[in-house]
Amino acid sequence: MRYDVVVVGSGVAGPIVARNVAKAGFSVLLVDKKPAIGAPKQCAEGLTINAFKQFDIPYDKRFINREIYGAKIYSPSGYTAELRYKEVSGVILERKVFDKMLAYYAAKAGAEVLARTEVVDVIRREGKIVGVKAKHEGEPMEIEAKVIVAADGVESTIARKAGIDTYAPPHEFDSGYEYEMIIEGFDPDLIHLFFGNEVAPRGYVWVFPKDEDRANVGIGINSDNEKTAKYYLDKWLKENNIPRNKILEVNVGLIPVGGFVKELVKENVLVVGDAARQVNPIHGGGMAEAMKASTIASKWIIKALEEENLELLKNYKEEWWKTEGPRMEKLLRLRRAMEKLTDEDLDVFVQLVSGTDLEKIAGGNYIEVVKALMKHPKVLMSRRRLEILKALL
């Protein structure tokens, strides 16, 4: 089997690369090791509304559970800050359908798609990578390709086999645990985020409504914690008198929140999405970031193939670090500052920020917010709080 491009992994990043490159007229094979693309999910399923237009994805009700109008955050002592829009700001997806439809769009654009196909190694000839070794339904196969895209998730095999350093220590990951469950008492038009060092160490609890009385209720905590994410989530449910006897689905996963893969390209191999740890360090969301990275990668793959010059692939790394890197590094600095906050600090800051401030913070445009906070008496009276905020400027 021989293709211009083989894409390993059919989550979010992989199908977008496959679709874009196939649309340009090149032969593409998209493979995924799972028997059913999209399952199991490892995601809270929230996506900004802007992504559909920005990345040319149909707004299809088949994979949209609920439209969302904003967010509400809760401090350890119950103080809240709310951001609410008049228009839809995001959606809660059905990832099992969404991911499969992304693969469908790639197939309709001309890509070939093979589920239950696990890539186990690269093929090298005369020191160069010329393809991948895989197993399709247990049968060995070799796939030759000019370009290989590693979009196979946080535990990427193919990037490692290609010699790309994707290692990160355990403390740079969060451990996630989530129930899809029946739950009542939360405004279903908003996502809800609960912070606190006793609630979710180094993370938060989320309630992402999928219906009036059904939601993804999950947690992310530092993966090197002596207690499990499940322990903290069950504790939060019990403390809030939320029965856990109507659980429809359980999902677990690792969330890379401590930094990004530096070497995004090596020879003819590109790494995108969770495999490159291209995840927003503040909220741990990776779908929109994967879409951005895969769009940039697609552009340079197409140019490299059109001009028959694979050296152009390096421009993916350069462009991502130039356009997305600075924002992501700022968010990483913010995350590291937030990890130093006590519950008392969290109470203070949640009382001081507005909904507009929350929007700026989540997008990495937090300098003005930080400067305003530094002038407030509750911050000025604490040298430690001032030092934490100064480090962000």
UniProtKB/Swiss-Prot annotation:
Pathway: Membrane lipid metabolism; glycerophospholipid metabolism. Belongs to the geranylgeranyl reductase family. DGGGPL reductase subfamily. It comes from Pyrococcus horikoshii (strain ATCC 700860 / DSM 12428 / JCM 9974 / NBRC 100139 / OT-3). InterPro entries: DGGGPL_reductase, FAD/NAD-bd_sf, Geranylgeranyl_Rdtase_fam, Geranylgeranyl_reductase, GGR_cat. FAD binds at residues 13, 32, 43-44, 46, 95, 119, 274, 286. GO terms for biological process: glycerophospholipid biosynthetic process; membrane lipid biosynthetic process. Its EC number is 1.3.-.-. Reduction reaction proceeds via syn addition of hydrogen for double bonds. GO terms for molecular function: flavin adenine dinucleotide binding; geranylgeranyl reductase activity; oxidoreductase activity, acting on the CH-CH group of donors, NAD or NADP as acceptor. GO terms for cellular component: membrane. A 2,3-bis-O-(geranylgeranyl)-sn-glycerol 1-phospholipid binds at residues 327, 363. Is involved in the reduction of 2,3-digeranylgeranylglycerophospholipids (unsaturated archaeols) into 2,3-diphytanylglycerophospholipids (saturated archaeols) in the biosynthesis of archaeal membrane lipids. Catalyzes the formation of archaetidic acid (2,3-di-O-phytanyl-sn-glyceryl phosphate) from 2,3-di-O-geranylgeranylglyceryl phosphate (DGGGP) via the hydrogenation of each double bond of the isoprenoid chains. It is an enzyme of class 1 (oxidoreductase). This is Digeranylgeranylglycerophospholipid reductase. Its cofactor is FAD. It catalyses: a 2,3-bis-O-phytanyl-sn-glycerol 1-phospholipid + 8 A = a 2,3-bis-O-(geranylgeranyl)-sn-glycerol 1-phospholipid + 8 AH2; 2,3-bis-O-(phytanyl)-sn-glycerol 1-phosphate + 8 A = 2,3-bis-O-(geranylgeranyl)-sn-glycerol 1-phosphate + 8 AH2; CDP-2,3-bis-O-(geranylgeranyl)-sn-glycerol + 8 AH2 = CDP-2,3-bis-O-(phytanyl)-sn-glycerol + 8 A; archaetidylserine + 8 AH2 = 2,3-bis-O-phytanyl-sn-glycero-3-phospho-L-serine + 8 A. Pfam families: FAD_oxidored, GGR_cat. Keywords: FAD, Flavoprotein, Lipid biosynthesis, Lipid metabolism, Oxidoreductase, Phospholipid biosynthesis, Phospholipid metabolism. Binds 1 FAD per subunit.
